[in-house]
Amino acid sequence: MKKLIQIVALSAFFTTTAQVPITTIPFELFGDHIIIKVSIDDSEPLDFIFDTGSGYTVLDDDIAGDLGLSGKKIEMNNAFSDWQLIKHNTLAINHFLMEKNIKVYSTDFDHLEISLGMDIDGIVGYDLLRHHAIYTNFDTKTINIYDLGKAPKKGDAIPFTMDTTIPVIKGNVVLNNEEPHDGSFYFITGAGTTLDFNSPYAKQWDVVHKTGKHYNYYVKGLSKEETLHYEGHVISFNFGNQKIEDLPIGISTATEGIQASKSVSGIIGSQIIRMYNFTIDYGTKMLYLEKDHTYDANFKVNCSGIDVQLSEDKQKVLVHQVFENSPASEAGIKLNDELLKINGMSMSEINLADVKKILKQEGETVEIVVSQGGAEKTASLKLRSLIY
C-alpha cells in the first residue's frame, strides 16, 4: 500500500512539474489580433503580431532601419514587396531569449498598418511554435511557454497536421442549402476572420451561391495586393467536439497564396480562436480548446455598409469601400470621404478597431460626420446586417 501511494505521489509530481511553464508573457488585443512584445539585439520592446499562419519572423523595414539592422535583398515566392534577410544576434519575446538559429526578415508593412489602423513592428509565429508548446489564455491575456510535449492537455483534444509551417485541423460545414461538406482548415491566429473558404474549395462546392444573402469587398494580406472577398453565412461549422451555428463566413477568390491552396479548404481565424483558451503543441501535433469567459457565439458583422482605413500618411480615417444597398450608401456616403466623428467622438479619441466595432452593432443608430468634397456631412446610420 505504501509503495502504491509513493507511485501515485511520484506520478502526480511529474504531472505537475511537466506543466510548469518556462515563462509567461502578457499580450494585448488590438481588434482581432494578439500583440506581444519582442526585442531584437536588446532593442526596446517592439509590437509584434502573434500569428500561427506566419512561417517567418518578419520585421517592418522602417523599424529595421531605426535599429540600424542591415540586410540582404532576397526573392520571396508570391511577394509583391521587397524582402530582406536581416543580420541580427538575438531575438527575445518579453525578455525570453529565443533560439539562435532564427532568421529574421524585413519588408514594408505600411499597407497592413493602413488597413488595421495600428503600427506593426513585426510578426512572429512558426519560429516560436517549432521550438515550444504554448497555452494562450484570453481571460488573463497571457501566453505560457513550455518545452515541446510539456504543455497542459486540457479541453477538447484535436489532432492537427502541418501544411508547410501552418497547423491544419479537420472540420465539417453545412451550407445554407443544407449540404454538408468535410474539409481541412488552417488554424491561424493572425487571420481576422471567423471562417474563410479557400477559392478552390469555394469554387468546387459553389459556396458563394449557397451562403444566403452576401456581399463582396476587398481584403489585404502580407502582400500589397487586394483580393475580392465575399461575406455570407452557413448553417453550422463543426471541428473537434465544437459546433458553431449560424456562422458568418468569408469566401476567397485568391489565385495566389494560402487561400488559393487546393489541399486545404480554408482558414479558421481569430474571431473563432479567441473564443477559446488553447494549447498548441507542434511536438505532439495536438490542439486543446477550452471555452474562455469571453466566449460568445453571437458574431458581429458589418452593419453599416462602409469599410474604413487610414490614409497613406496615417493621419486620416477614410471610407475605403461603400457597399450597395446598405445604410451608408442610402445615406449618401461616398468612397474616400474622410470620417471626422462617430457618435460625437473625433478620430483622435478612438482607434480604428473600435470604430469598426461600433459599425457592427446591429439595431443601433450611429451618427457619423464626414468630410465630402470639402464640406461636412452628417448622417445617421440605422445599422442592419448585410448578410441576414
Model-derived features with residue positions:
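Bacterial Sec-dependent N-terminal signal peptides
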Residues: 1-23
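Pepsin/retropepsin-fold aspartyl endopeptidases
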Residues: 18-388
